[in-house]
Amino acid sequence: ILRADSFKKPVFYNGSTFLFDKFAIFLKNNAHIIKINNQLHIYKDGIYTAGYGEIEAAMIKHIPDLNRAKRSEVVDYLDLLIRDNTKPEDAHLIAFKNGLYNIIDGSFVGFTPEHIITNKIPWDYTPGAYCELADKTLDNIACHDSQVRLLLEEAIGYCFYRWNELGKAFILTGDKSNGKSTYLSMVQNLLGEENICALDLKELGDRFKTAEMFGKLANIGDDIGDEFIANPAVFKKLVTGDRVSAERKGQNPFEFNNYSKFLFSANQIPRIKDKTGAVQRRLVIIPFDANFSKDKAGFDPTIKHKLKSPDTMEYLINLGLAGLKRILENRGFTDSDKVKKALDEYEEDNNPILGFFKECEDEDFHIEDNTTDLVYSRYQEYCLANNLQAMSKTAFSRQIARNLHLHTEVRRIGKKTARFYVAGDQK
């Protein structure tokens, strides 16, 4: 056994001079320090961990009295010494507390430094694990809807997968006391605090906030605000795993491909600027219709605490893995009538002109073959009645063309002319 005193001077000191370069090379080779996305990582407990803190902790194991200045010197040298990035392991290999599970072939192996993984679920993988309480809770949360239940399981499994292949974000909706926070609490406890962050939708794109998602399995935003999101560009990139730039205070900016999954809960989903529908295509809106109140039979105010047990977590792991296998096999999530309805309703809320179209349909008002002035005037009345900001007439006509495939055409009415919305090819 090497003691710090015995090798300190002959190996890492020349007289009183600290040989920071030799010590850095020693650490690199013996503590398995690499770069991922230009960020230094060190191998610890089966995975590679980012951050200078763990690297400095490894230093003082060898030289306990190494001061901060010398530790910083070593870190700076490591940053220069290690120039190339190491590619992380494929997403199909998932780390649990007791080993690595391969979602493709179902194999389970031990940890080695050769497997470059940066996240570990802090619970054991136990085939066949079951928890009756968790099973019943998920059924109750889903209101015994099998499609919703499968989606809840798939959302868990999708968090295990370090790749945003499907480009989807989950939003759980509904009033209070319906199980949203209980479900998210289970997911948070399952993934572990070190694997999650908690940004609101409106915070995405803030200068230093995006960096918080680097290396996380999930961003879990409970009870997000309903403020209008005017610039969702960063959100779209993060959901699809496109490369984004991030920055930590006092450090150089860096780029990364996000694999963190989004799970938000909201009483009311914020409106998002989405002219092309690109944001809406990324959303999976799951309605939570249950009612867990004090006057209901079986109400348990301690349910969140009870659902933190190892039995619950190991059962959720099995459900999540089964859900992930379904996702990969089907190349998508389980279809749900409730989810489709919720998404259609949000589309109407998010793009008020769709609500106007629906009102026209309900009241048998035909946009086609009506004058643009009359239709726009009716649209303004609709906005006024619903406390909405009306878009300009030009923008309104663009929306008519995009959604209803109508263009404008000048026609004569008696001695006057007027512009009408018409179908067919534009002349």
Show where each model-derived region lies.
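Replication-associated primase and helicase/ATPase modules
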Residues: 1-29, 123-140, 355, 412-427
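Intein modules and their embedded homing endonuclease domains
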Residues: 2-123, 391
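A short, contiguous, amphipathic alpha-helix enriched in charged residues
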Residues: 17-20, 143, 188-193, 228-244, ...
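P-loop NTPase catalytic core of nucleic-acid-dependent motor ATPases
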Residues: 30-54, 100-217, 284-286, 320, ...
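Positively charged interface segments
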Residues: 68, 72, 82-83, 87-90, ...
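Loop/turn-to-beta-strand initiation segments
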Residues: 215-218, 258-262
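Conserved AAA+/SF3 P-loop NTPase catalytic/coupling segment centered on the Walker-B
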Residues: 217-241, 254, 272-279
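Phosphate-handling catalytic cores of nucleic-acid transaction enzymes
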Residues: 310-351
